[in-house]
């Protein structure tokens, strides 16, 4: 049984931890508001760009003027998987959900005899995936020093992906990230970037993608410029969604930790009081016994 001093020290330690988790919850809540605003602001632009891309792709079809980023290589032998997670932990199961979702996809591809290459955006996803797929990871994007995610961060990743595609390094590229729904709900999501699937995008964007436009210059030339930018835009949106999801998960995790610390303090305080009461009672009995002996 721990002594009164041990219990007192443990209560003080848990109280100190509770102060830290409470402060982290408040910081995450403040960051969440800004991250949520950024993610929600990026959605209409990325969705509209996807709709315009789908419209132009339908106009071009599969003729010779269609860029390879849209039509693909005609094969699906080699897959590039981009996994976006957080750089830090203490956010519940946020990172593990994305990593598990991507891991299942990679295993499915490997079971089908496909070649898989992985780019990890974020330290936590890298740490989790390298346990099983160390030989498949070809690059890791480090964003630890980035205080605020900007389009330039996504654009660098997009250029890297297009460079690999132009070199014939892969046939299909899929982006994995967590779509922010609410503080307690972040949905692991997979989005195909290359080849740009006009049919899927059109279905996702609804009737807005079926409007009729006239293009100047011709549609194929517009697609050649629009698809690379769309890749960067979709990656940018994924990064913003991830930041919002991470902050939401962190706020929820720190709230749970703060409440758990409070419950532990109550239990330890009860144990301390009971033991102190027992010790006082014992001392009183000894005093009374001594007095009676006299």
Curated annotation (Swiss-Prot):
Cellular location(s): Cell inner membrane
Keywords recorded for this protein, A-Z: ATP synthesis, Cell inner membrane, Cell membrane, CF(1), Hydrogen ion transport, Ion transport, Membrane, Transport
GO molecular function: ATP binding; proton-transporting ATP synthase activity, rotational mechanism
GO biological process entries: proton motive force-driven plasma membrane ATP synthesis
SUPFAM superfamilies: ATP synthase (F1-ATPase), gamma subunit (SSF52943)
This protein's record includes keyword Lipid metabolism: no
Annotated Pfam families: ATP-synt (PF00231)
Domain of life: Bacteria
Gene Ontology CC terms, in alphabetical order: plasma membrane; proton-transporting ATP synthase complex
Membrane topology label: Peripheral membrane protein
Family the entry assigns: Belongs to the ATPase gamma chain family.
Function (record text): Produces ATP from ADP in the presence of a proton gradient across the membrane. The gamma chain is believed to be important in regulating ATPase activity and the flow of protons through the CF(0) complex.
Subunit structure: F-type ATPases have 2 components, CF(1) - the catalytic core - and CF(0) - the membrane proton channel. CF(1) has five subunits: alpha(3), beta(3), gamma(1), delta(1), epsilon(1). CF(0) has three main subunits: a, b and c.
The name this protein goes by in its record: ATP synthase gamma chain
Source organism per UniProt: Rhizobium meliloti (strain 1021) (Ensifer meliloti)
Gene name of the encoded protein: atpG
């Amino acid at each position: 049984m721990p002594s009164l001093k041990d219990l007192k020290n443990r209560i003080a330690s848990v109280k100190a931890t509770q102060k830290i988790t409470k402060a982290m919850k408040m910081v995450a809540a403040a960051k969440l508001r800004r991250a949520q605003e950024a993610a929600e602001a990026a959605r209409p632009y990325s969705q509209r760009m996807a709709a315009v891309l789908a419209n132009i792709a339908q106009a071009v079809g599969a003729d010779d003027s269609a860029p390879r980023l849209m039509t693909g290589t005609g094969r699906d032998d080699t897959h590039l998987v981009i996994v976006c997670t957080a750089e830090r932990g203490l956010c519940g199961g946020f990172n593990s959900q994305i990593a598990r979702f991507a891991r299942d996809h990679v295993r499915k591809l490997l079971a089908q005899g496909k070649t898989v290459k992985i780019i990890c955006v974020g330290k936590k996803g890298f740490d989790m995936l390298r346990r099983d797929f160390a030989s498949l990871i070809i690059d890791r994007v480090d964003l630890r020093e980035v205080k605020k995610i900007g389009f330039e961060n996504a654009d660098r990743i997009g250029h890297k992906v297009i460079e690999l595609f132009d070199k014939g390094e892969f046939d299909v590229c899929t982006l994995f990230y967590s779509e922010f729904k609410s503080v307690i709900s972040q949905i692991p999501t997979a989005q195909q970037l290359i080849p740009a699937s006009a049919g899927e995008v059109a279905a996702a964007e609804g009737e807005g993608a079926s409007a009729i436009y006239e293009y100047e210059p011709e549609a194929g030339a517009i697609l050649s410029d629009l698809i690379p930018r769309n890749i960067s835009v979709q990656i940018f949106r994924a990064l913003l969604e991830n930041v919002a999801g991470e902050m939401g998960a962190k706020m929820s995790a720190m709230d749970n930790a703060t409440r758990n610390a409070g419950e532990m303090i109550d239990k330890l305080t009860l144990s301390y009081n009971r033991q102190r009461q027992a010790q006082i009672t014992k001392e009183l009995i000894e005093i009374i016994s001594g007095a009676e002996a006299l």
